[in-house]
Amino acid sequence: MGTVVSKKENLRNDAISSVAAKVRAARAFGEYLSHTRPENRNRSDHLLSDTFIGQETDSPDISRLNNNNSLQPYSQHTLIVKPSQEELQQGSQSAPLPTSSKRRLSVERSLSSEDQQNQRRTESSVKPARVYTITRERDMLGGQGSEESLELEVLKRTSEPSQINPPTGLRGSHHRGSQHRGNNGPTHQHHYGHAPMAQPLQSSGSTHNIRDWGSRRSRSREDCTPDCVACIRPHCQSQRSLDLDTSPHGGGKQHKKLERMYSEDRVSSEDREDHTNSWFPKENMFSFQTATTTMQAISNFRKHLRMVGSRRVKAQTFVDRKAKSFSRSWSDPTPVKPDSLHDSRDSGDLQASSGNLDEEDCDDVDWEEERELERVACEGDDFIPPKLMLISSKVPKAEYVPNIIRRDDPSIIPILYDHEHATFDDILEEIEKKLTAYRKGCKIWNMLIFCQGGPGHLYLLKNKVATFAKVEKEEGMMQFWKKLGRFMSLLNPEPNLIHIMGCYVLGNANGEKLFQNLKRLMKPHGIEFKSPLELSAQGKEMIEMYFDFRLYRLWKTRQHSKLHDYDDLL
């Protein structure tokens, strides 16, 4: 809607500027006549008197101009202004002169009668006169009477004039439609009783005087049209508007063309902006940061240098990671794996049952072998069962967690992994390396998973959320927990503990279901999951098992602070 209004305003301004140009041309033409024809110098000043908006037609200048035009004899080239009916009536009647002497009045009347006789003699002997008039056309702009254009027309008289001022009765009968309306109404008058042949000289005027024409108009063109056919001036075929088309179809086409050009320009500019910046990766665009966020970025960079999975950033670009990442939300339903390709249920069930029996036998054999290997590796009085800490970089200030662990317990093995770029295989590979470095062949007795999450779910990796449904249906999630179970100890007489810290998974019933499904996946190893609240007694016991309690409280108080005063922790 705003675009249509602005286009209409632009069309209106263009029309007004065109009319202003026409009036300026008319004024220049009048000045030219005043210089070239000295006898017309006084009358050329009033050529545009009827076009000015603020000038009243009843002013003394206009009435004196009309009287002069009726009294002075016509030369070969005469300039007059189209008068209105009231002006003609005033011109036909002798205007009273402000004199006190009747003798002076009689002398002036005798002079006027002699001038009229001389005028008739001159008209019979000279060539046809050219009369320059200024008319106002309403239909040139194609509007609803809001604006109007001026046209300077050169009218050539083709025959002898019958009378300069026709009788009042004839004017009243023929020109009822051309009543003078204020100082802006279009005037119409018989010039020597003939319809003229017009050759318009289109010109312009000042813009500030033209803007109020539409508001001063109160009647339509039909009210101003004379009744007689002879009074109607035929439109010239060469008369055209310089800026607008009067036909409605042409206007509509022009509107559509403007809209199309605007849309093409807008699209082309957007495409140019996109093409200029397309070569530069948008993820690397420099953004103005505060000092706090800059320091945080520096610390994160140092954190990624020693983080598991951060090396993958150099190997993969941002686009490849975005294309290969798991884009589904953790709350979306997981697609169910298709059934086996065997259509016969009987043969499939028999093969599955026989396969399960074979796998159970193999698992029993492997379980015994692994247990013996672990017993051999863990012999000695100096052996302390390892405690593994798996810390996600998604935890706020996670880079300081390795500095707040218990320093009197060498069995704690912290592993900080990259939440954004690491994979399950990277985590399992790092766990195997750390256990081998601690003691070859040993297994985990206690484990802490420090990550984000909530009631019923664990946010282990980016786009990898462990829920009770997804750990049963997503292949990657299932394989991770199964392989993680193989790193758990077989020598521990009690179930191996896996503490979940950083979130309260048991906040609803789905958390218990998640723990049950994870236990089933990690069999035959005995696993027990715990996720106590940190403020509870069990939570304090869990914290003291892995952390220095004083440093942990200091780290916890400054975990969400933007200040980097960790000198006590470092």
UniProtKB/Swiss-Prot annotation:
The residues forming the signal peptide are none
Subcellular location(s) per record: Nucleus; Nucleus envelope; Nucleus membrane; Nucleus matrix
As for membrane topology, the entry says: Peripheral membrane protein
Quote the InterPro entries the UniProt record gives. Answer: NSMF
Protein name, as recorded? NMDA receptor synaptonuclear signaling and neuronal migration factor
Q: GO:BP terms for this protein?
A: positive regulation of axon extension; positive regulation of neuron migration; regulation of neuronal synaptic plasticity
Enumerate the residue ranges of region (Disordered).
85-224, 239-278, 327-362
Database matches in PANTHER family: NMDA RECEPTOR SYNAPTONUCLEAR SIGNALING AND NEURONAL MIGRATION FACTOR (PTHR32061)
Q: Which organism is it from?
A: Danio rerio (Zebrafish)
Q: Where is the composition biased (Basic and acidic residues)?
A: 209-224, 259-276, 339-348
Q: Where is the lipid attached (N-myristoyl glycine)?
A: G2
Residue ranges with Polar residues bias: 86-99
| Superkingdom per UniProt | Eukaryota
Q: Which gene encodes it?
A: nsmf
Q: Please state which protein family the record places this protein in.
A: Belongs to the NSMF family.
